[in-house]
């Protein structure tokens, strides 16, 4: 792994951890109630952080290893972009016409053996069609911007690494 690619992955790891902490702070400090799609995006942020950590621990030595790392990091980020885009579409619908976004994660994972440990991460009962704003911008837009930045950064670093 070239120094540039490694630095970029370290940066993505740090930003991902901060984004995950920010999502928890928005819920537990600011009192925002996340919906099912918000929690799905939070899990994609956590998966992105875990993927960057795995790539950093594996230390691929060849360009093909860097390619694997870029693809591995991009998978949860692209998933997060698609979830954010779906939530933005739901929020663009006229009030009362948006479909339900599904059962809460706490209901879905209740029988899971690690539920008690993981429950604070997936707790939330907000409405997916009701937008919450941060600095005047809807939260799914911030989420999509973060995921897009992850994808662009990892592929830029891979392309520049020679």
Curated annotation (Swiss-Prot):
It is found in: Cell inner membrane. GO terms for molecular function: electron transfer activity; protein-disulfide reductase activity. It is a multi-pass membrane protein. The chain crosses the membrane at residues 9-25, 44-60, 68-85, 142-160. Required for disulfide bond formation in some periplasmic proteins. Acts by oxidizing the DsbA protein. Residues 26-43, 86-141 are periplasmic. This is Disulfide bond formation protein B. It comes from Neisseria meningitidis serogroup C / serotype 2a (strain ATCC 700532 / DSM 15464 / FAM18). HAMAP family: DsbB. Keywords: Cell inner membrane, Cell membrane, Chaperone, Disulfide bond, Electron transport, Membrane, Oxidoreductase, Redox-active center, Transmembrane, Transmembrane helix, Transport. InterPro entries: DiS_bond_form_DsbB/BdbC, Disulphide_bond_form_DsbB, DsbB, DsbB-like_sf. GO terms for biological process: protein folding. Belongs to the DsbB family.
């Amino acid at each position: 792994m070239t120094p540039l690619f490694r630095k970029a992955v370290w940066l993505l790891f740090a930003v991902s951890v901060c984004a995950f902490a920010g999502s928890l702070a928005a819920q537990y400090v600011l009192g925002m109630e996340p919906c099912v799609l918000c929690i799905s995006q939070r899990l994609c942020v956590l998966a992105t952080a875990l993927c960057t950590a795995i790539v950093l621990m594996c230390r691929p030595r060849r360009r093909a290893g860097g390619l694997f790392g870029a693809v591995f990091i991009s998978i949860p980020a692209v998933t997060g972009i698609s979830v954010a885009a779906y939530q933005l579409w739901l929020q663009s619908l006229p009030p009362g016409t948006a479909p339900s976004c599904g059962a809460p994660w706490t209901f879905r994972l209740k029988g899971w053996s690690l539920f008690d440990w993981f429950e604070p991460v997936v707790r939330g009962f907000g409405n997916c069609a009701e937008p919450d704003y941060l600095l005047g911008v809807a939260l799914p837009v911030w989420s999509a911007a973060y995921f897009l930045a992850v994808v662009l950064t990892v592929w830029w670093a891979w392309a520049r690494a020679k």
